Amino acid sequence: MTAVDYDWEFLEDGVRIEPISIGMKAEDGREYYAVNGLLAARGWKGWRFRRRVRKHKWLMENVIPHLPQPHGDWRNHMPQSWLFNYLDPAVKPIERIADEVMDFIRATGPDVQLWADYGAYDHVCLAQLWGRMIDLPEGVPMFTNDIQQEARRQGLGWDDLPKQDGGVHNALADARHNQTVRRLLVGRAAGEAA
C-alpha cells in the first residue's frame, strides 16, 4: 500500500465547501502545501471570499494564523488589512493547485490510498478541484479512508490516539500528524491480522 495523508482547511457554510489551504504527505516523504489564491484575488470574488472568512470567528482564530505570515521587512510593508502573506509562493490559483494535487497523487503510484482525519468534507473539497465527483481525474481515488473510522473499528477512542504537538489547523502539520496516526492504526491492524 502507498498512502497520501492529507488535510484541507476550508470555509463551509452548509451549502458550499470553499478551500483555504491543503497539506499532503506521501509515504515516500514528499510533501505538498498550497493556499487558495482566491483569498488574495482582486475583484469581487476575492473580496467576497475574504469578507466571508473574516466574518468566521473560528477560522480567524484557528486557521488564518497558520497561513504564511510575512517575515523580516515584509511585516513593515504589508497592509494591516491583509490576512496573511499573499505574496508567498504557496499562494496559487485553484486551477494550479488542482493540477499539482493530481500530479502529487499520481506520483505516489497506481494503488494509492488517501487518508484524512474526519475525511468526508476533505474528500468533497478534493473532488471539487475538478468539478463534479464523477470528473475525478484518472489516478485520483474515488474515496478517502477515514482515520476516525479506522480507530473506532479497532475499538480506539480519541484519547487513545497520538496527540498533535503543534500546528493544529495548519494543513501541512495536520497532514503530517495524520500520517503518524494512520501508521499506528495500520500497524495495529496488521498485528490483528497476524
Please provide the spans of the model-predicted regions.
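Conserved non-catalytic scaffold segment of RNase H-like nuclease domains
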Residues: T2-V4, E9-A116
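Amphipathic alpha-helical core segments of compact helical bundles
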Residues: M102, G131, R152-G155
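Acidic, Mg2+-coordinating catalytic module of metal-dependent nucleases/exonucleases
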Residues: P110-A120, V124-Q128, W158-A194
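Short, flexible loop segments at boundaries between secondary-structure elements
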Residues: E138-D159
